[in-house]
């Protein structure tokens, strides 16, 4: 299933996206300090690679183990995996982009619902 590959790509990107800002996190005032909007959104973007990666891995392995497939759920989970970090990083520097969080969140919620429906 493509979701397993997407999971491992997400893990790789999560490592890279954590290593690069990690070079600068020691600066107390970097990007406005620890609690600043940009710094929080960069952390969220970094961790979203791992979080949605685990959801993709779970969907892929569960699908294989139970012989359950749902193409719409698979595509929606991939949309969530691609758009969540994108919206996080865009929102970090242009707060207006925060209004797009419904796209990745809705994709993941709908993907999970559709996949769960196929399992029941």
What residue ranges belong to the model's regions?
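Polytopic transmembrane helical bundles with strong interfacial aromatic enrichment
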Residues: 1-43, 50-120
């Amino acid at each position: 299933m493509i979701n397993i590959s997407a999971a491992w790509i997400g893990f790789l990107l999560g490592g890279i996206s954590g290593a690069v800002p990690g070079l600068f996190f020691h600066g107390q005032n970097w990007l406005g300090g620890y609690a600043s909007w940009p710094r929080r959104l960069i952390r969220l973007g970094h961790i979203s690679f791992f979080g949605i990666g685990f959801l993709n891995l779970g969907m892929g392995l569960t699908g294989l183990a139970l012989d359950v497939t749902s193409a719409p759920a698979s595509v929606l989970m991939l949309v969530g995996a691609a758009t969540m970090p994108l919206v996080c990083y865009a929102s970090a520097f242009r707060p207006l982009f925060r209004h797009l969080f419904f796209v990745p969140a809705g994709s993941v919620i709908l993907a999970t619902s559709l996949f769960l429906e196929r399992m029941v």
